[in-house]
Amino acid sequence: KGVLSTMDIMIRQKEARVIFNETEPLYVWADEFKTEEVVTNYVSNALHHLDGEKIVEIKVQKQENRVKVTVFNTGTPIPEADLPNLWNKFYKVDKARTREYGGSGIGLSIVKAIMEGMNQQYGVQNFDNGVEFWFTLDRK
């Protein structure tokens, strides 16, 4: 929720519709600041690659012994050939588009380093109408 309030200006500039249905508090084993960095990265990327209905949907789902956080945005799916390289430092799928907003290509490599440092899972999934990035955290 804090990430969304810090990004409020960007959300309004992009005319995005952000959907975040709060659930009951979930307690996890994680570094608060590093987790916030991952969410910020995912939401920022979602806003930069927003298209179509301009929807960004954030979900926090309770699983058996984990919590799964997903950030979905409407837009063009990422080409399958690019998916394995997304987590590499300085990798950019669409260089021209990234130049428009000044992206450096290091955001997802930071996500990778944080999640691997916490021994957690992370990933991306294409849908017909957009892309979803996700990560998991162990529950307390």
Task: Name each model feature, range by range.
Residues 52, 119-120:
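Conserved glycine-rich
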Residues 102, 107, 111:
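Short alpha-helical Gxxx[C/S/T] motif in the catalytic ATP-binding
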Residues 12, 17-26:
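Conserved catalytic submotifs in the C-terminal HATPase_c
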Residues 35-36:
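A residue-level detector for a conserved hydrophobic packing site
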Residues 53-65:
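Short beta-strand/loop element within the Bergerat-fold HATPase_c
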Residues 46-47:
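Short helix-loop "hinge" at the ATP-lid/N-box region of the Bergerat-fold HATPase_c
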Residues 78-92:
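Short conserved segment of the HATPase_c
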